[in-house]
Amino acid sequence: MPLPVQVFNLQGAVEPMQIDVDPQEDPQNAPDVNYVVENPSLDLEQYAASYSGLMRIERLQFIADHCPTLRVEALKMALSFVQRTFNVDMYEEIHRKLSEATRSSLRELQNAPDAIPESGVEPPALDTAWVEATRKKALLKLEKLDTDLKNYKGNSIKESIRRGHDDLGDHYLDCGDLSNALKCYSRARDYCTSAKHVINMCLNVIKVSVYLQNWSHVLSYVSKAESTPEIAEQRGERDSQTQAILTKLKCAAGLAELAARKYKQAAKCLLLASFDHCDFPELLSPSNVAIYGGLCALATFDRQELQRNVISSSSFKLFLELEPQVRDIIFKFYESKYASCLKMLDEMKDNLLLDMYLAPHVRTLYTQIRNRALIQYFSPYVSADMHRMAAAFNTTVAALEDELTQLILEGLISARVDSHSKILYARDVDQRSTTFEKSLLMGKEFQRRAKAMMLRAAVLRNQIHVKSPPREGSQGELTPANSQSRMSTNM
């Protein structure tokens, strides 16, 4: 339950009721990590093709953990992709999961009398030859890169040392050793000789920090990259390379803000991404930008912001073309067709729950979108029939009454519920007296500012300088300046 909860009555507002619960520990905000998705409509091959490197493998593993129907297929794909790397430990882990999933599928087939046995159900055997060969190759490459780096340091050539650290970081990342990869990429900072090198170092650190889910580190290095002269000093039209870098930084920042549950800030970052320069498969796909940005904007933007920043955005329109369902949801919401909008949201919920970065926020975002729809629906009315309102939101009157009561308690709707007649009444606010109160407060503020300006002008005109009082312990000491001033006053 959000904090604080405010209770209103007709005579006036009473003190808000405080509940001693940390919002982070609130079960409503806590993500459910043990959920199962039964009916996804996900094209796994197309989905995996949108990513590269470790991100592709991690996303496939996440799908396997939460979707029984896609588990075996996702693990088989992850197993084939991991064999293109030096990550032997992950290969063995995925193979173990695949063996367990396959045995489970076989047991289900044996228990079902009408089931037709599938070909290729047996898991592939553990490729021990590949494991041993890959371990040796990884060790030899590590020794070579380490020797090269020592030679570069002996020659004291900064550019070679920087590249040596980057190569070592790339190798550690390929082996799945994220902590050592982060150390190597960070050490390259001391050997950067241009803004381009600093940006490259920041992007490498950001990438590994996302894999480690160290979101404060991500935002810190996004800020460092944006403050480099190559990015900060360019105004107006940017060249293609700079725009591509800026898009990567905004995507990473949007992902970090999403993880921190700062949905409005996440939407603002993602809306600044350029479609023509969105090429960051190590972290996000353009479809992710459309979904994350669209849902966060729906949950936090008012109608004017939604129209100005999303619907009228020429760049974000191109992202939405990749996800027509999200585009239609945004337009239905803006056109106040809330029943259709919420129905379409429910239809795509299963697929969203298979996204490793969005899944923990789906319930919260859906609740905020629904609450914003209820608030916008009621805002123009003095009273509203809850039967018609329930029909508009495709729900029951009893469920709607509970939702409205919660919104009133949270102070999001200024209204009262007539439970007998099932009518929602807006609280009677005297607009005339409210306007007079605002006018009086504004007048007092103008008076205060005018008096302050007149006082400052008088002080400057009369050349009055107010000296700060002497520091403690320095009263008995004489400096040349105050010694001379004391002598002049004595004379």
Swiss-Prot record:
Major location (coarse): cytoplasm
Per UniProt, the keywords (alphabetical) are: Cytoplasm, Nucleus, Phosphoprotein, Signalosome
Q: Where in the cell is it found?
A: Cytoplasm; Nucleus
Where is composition skewed (Polar residues) in this entry? 476-491
User: What are the Phosphoserine sites (modified residues) in this protein?
Assistant: 468, 474, 483
A GO cellular-component term linked to this record: nucleus
**Which SUPFAM superfamilies does this entry report, sorted A to Z?**
Winged helix' DNA-binding domain
Where expressed (tissue)? Widely expressed.
MF term (GO), any: GTPase inhibitor activity
Q: Where is this region: Disordered?
A: 465-491
Point out residues bearing the modification Phosphothreonine. 479
Question: Which PANTHER family would you find in this protein's record?
Answer: 26S PROTESOME SUBUNIT 6, COP9 SIGNALOSOME COMPLEX SUBUNIT 1
**Quaternary structure per UniProt?**
Component of the CSN complex, composed of COPS1/GPS1, COPS2, COPS3, COPS4, COPS5, COPS6, COPS7 (COPS7A or COPS7B), COPS8 and COPS9 isoform 1. In the complex, it probably interacts directly with COPS2, COPS3, COPS4 and COPS5. Interacts directly with inositol kinase ITPK1. Interacts with CAPN8. Interacts with USP48. Interacts with ASB4; this interaction negatively regulates GPS1.
What's noted about domains in the record?
A: The PCI domain is necessary and sufficient for the interactions with other CSN subunits of the complex. Mediates the interaction with CAPN8. The N-terminal part (1-216), which is not required for deneddylating activity and CSN complex formation, is nevertheless essential for other aspects of CSN complex function, such as repression of c-fos/FOS expression.
Function comment: Essential component of the COP9 signalosome complex (CSN), a complex involved in various cellular and developmental processes. The CSN complex is an essential regulator of the ubiquitin (Ubl) conjugation pathway by mediating the deneddylation of the cullin subunits of SCF-type E3 ligase complexes, leading to decrease the Ubl ligase activity of SCF-type complexes such as SCF, CSA or DDB2. The complex is also involved in phosphorylation of p53/TP53, c-jun/JUN, IkappaBalpha/NFKBIA, ITPK1 and IRF8/ICSBP, possibly via its association with CK2 and PKD kinases.
Record-given protein name: COP9 signalosome complex subunit 1
